[in-house]
Amino acid sequence: MTEQKQVKKPSARRRARECTVQALYSWAVSGNTAEQVELAFVLDQDMDGVDKPYFRKLFRQTVENIETVDFSISPYIDRAFDELDPIETAILRLAVYELCFELDVPYKVVINEAIEVAKVFGADESHKYINGVLDKIAPALGRK
């Protein structure tokens, strides 16, 4: 008898975070407005299983608060923003937005979700980098 590992389907919120990272990436590299990116994303992407209102909230609020988010990240990264991988930047931006503004989400959940999203979209070792940066940022924001 062979055992099959059951693959757990990502939660609707995880899918919302994955979509938010993709939309933040698109926004950063395309030069399009947040509204254009959001509309194109919702129309063109597979949004099955996504908590769409949560996606919209995360994307809009991260963009709206981008200066605060980037200011919070800057002291904890080892290079300039423009030298970071754009996917890593998008993941960090989303996670730091959540750490700063979504206080009902436990910081361990924020960090774990960022790591899991990095495993899906990032380079081979990017989840380790994301974890290291967020482990420094969370206490600085009073989230530990």
From Swiss-Prot:
Highest taxon of source: Bacteria
GO biological process: DNA-templated transcription termination; transcription antitermination
CDD domains assigned to the protein according to its UniProt record, in alphabetical order: Terminator_NusB
GO molecular function, one term: RNA binding
Cysteine pairs bridged by disulfides in the record: none
InterPro entries xref list: NusB-like_sf, NusB_fam, NusB_RsmB_TIM44
Similarity comment: Belongs to the NusB family.
Designated name of the protein: Transcription antitermination protein NusB
Origin organism lineage: Bacteria, Pseudomonadati, Pseudomonadota, Gammaproteobacteria, Pasteurellales
Gene: nusB
